[in-house]
Amino acid sequence: MPTTEAPTYTVVSSHYGDLFWIRHMLTQVQALSGGAVTGAVIVDQSRESEAALRALPLVTEVLTFEPDAAQIAVEGHDHPSALDRALQQGTFTTSHIIVMDSDAFPVSSEWISHLDDISLALVPGSTSQTHPCLMAFPAELRAVVNFSEDYLERAQRKGAPDTGRRVGKQLQQTGRPVTLLEHTPAFNGYRGSFYLGGTFYHHGHGSFMAGGHDQYKGFVSQASEKLYRKRVLQHRFSLTPLDFTGLFIRYVRRRVFNRIRLALRGPSAKPQ
């Protein structure tokens, strides 16, 4: 770190769906940050959970914004806009901000010591595109960060940037050193990623299990996600032979069920 004083952090995240992931994330951060994280600014994208969110650990602000219609028209959500507005309108008194997905959380008290002045998770498989599951940077640079950059291009161009993919480039242009964090696979390579030397876990698409995104209903199996949630609470991030058997059976049942639904109801059938 360029300063002699120990950095302090405010977490920024957005919530959608049920409270499982956001509650677990904040509980883990509070337990494993050694007091370095002093608050959390949460965007309620469910727009109905403000009271419940205010009762969670570390929460200092719950923000609710009008939907960004242009972004929602692209993929059914306005996550980039929500994070941008949180940085612009939230109250920050700490030296640093940590943006985290609600289904990302530390698993070791060493995670804070692994953070540099600017530390940004990379999208798995990329050497430049950054991911909002974990982004730490000085609060004074929040005006530089734009999670929405080029996001609307996804409506016309396959492979256009998703949420926060340009943040690494934006912060590099400030001239400050930027540490890009590579992932290692979790759950035997089938689900989730570790960052910061295995001290931080990101599940990925966790909120879709309880959310209302029709286009993502077939992206994750709700039955399989129940197993992963159970293992997360047990602090176990690998699968047993019995787990593999159960996941395979659920996968086959889901494929057969969705094919039958498609045959009976046609293109209007939503995958489950």
Model segments located where?
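Active-site-proximal specificity loops/subdomain of glycosyltransferases
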Residues: E48-T93
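A conserved hydrophobic helix/loop-capping motif in glycosyltransferases and polysaccharide synthases
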Residues: Y9-D18, L32
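Conserved catalytic core of nucleotide-sugar-dependent glycosyltransferases
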Residues: F105-Q173
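Short, acidic, metal-binding catalytic loop of nucleotide-sugar glycosyltransferases
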Residues: T27-V37
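Short beta-strand-to-loop acidic/aromatic patch adjacent to the donor-nucleotide binding site
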Residues: T94-F105
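Short, charged/polar "capping" segments at the starts of alpha-helices
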Residues: D18-I22, S46-L53
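Short beta-strand/loop segment that forms part of the nucleotide-sugar
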Residues: V37-E48
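C-terminal catalytic/acceptor-binding lobe
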Residues: G164-Q272
